[in-house]
Amino acid sequence: VELVRAQGGQSYEFILREGKTYDTIMDVRHLRSEMGVIYLCSFNEAVIKKTLRESNLVFSELFSARPHIFIGRNNPLAGRERVNMKDLESLPCLTYEQGDQNSFYFSEEILSTLNHEKSIKVTDKGTIIDLMTGTDGYTISSGICPSYLRGDDIISIPLDVEEIIRIGVITH
């Protein structure tokens, strides 16, 4: 919203898409998009930076955040101030599907290589929100979720892991 307000003016055309990490990089590389928003962490940084270099793209960090989980307000962990990975073992892990050609380095979530007893992959934000509110499922993210998207139904709880999520834009 702030980007549209800041860049708007008398006439403009914005196309805002939610997509897979690899597709976002390729869209900017092939000039289908002027910029993309992705994240880096210690696990994916080398592979994504290599892909960005090969694509003549630059990552500019906007901010960094400690990981959080998003859960529905009726989740058994909803009253906790913090959670750790052991607390999540019996709950469904909700992640974004990345397609056939993409490795786990292009995952939308950190800690993507961990095995989960229960796992559900989705392709869109609406489905993941429905699953968070309708099951005991969780997803790992930056902790930033606009209130208009979640209302009071989704809550964010800090996750005790030694990881930092660096969110930024990619451009030429």
Which role does the model predict for each range below?
Residues V1-I48:
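Central regulatory/effector-binding core of bacterial HTH transcription factors
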Residues E13-R17, S60, S119-K121, I157:
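General small-molecule cofactor/ligand-binding pocket signal
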Residues E18-Y22, N56, R82, V122-K125:
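Structural motif corresponding to alpha-helix initiation and N-cap regions
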Residues Y22-R29, F59, M85, I128-I129:
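Short hydrophobic/charged patches on amphipathic alpha-helices used for structural packing
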Residues D27-M35, Y39, Q98-I155:
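Hydrophobic hinge/microswitch elements
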Residues E45-A46, L77, M85-L114:
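Secondary-structure junction motif
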Residues T51-C93:
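Flexible hinge/capping segments at coil-to-helix
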Residues L52-S60, S64-R66, G126-H172:
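Beta-alpha-beta core module
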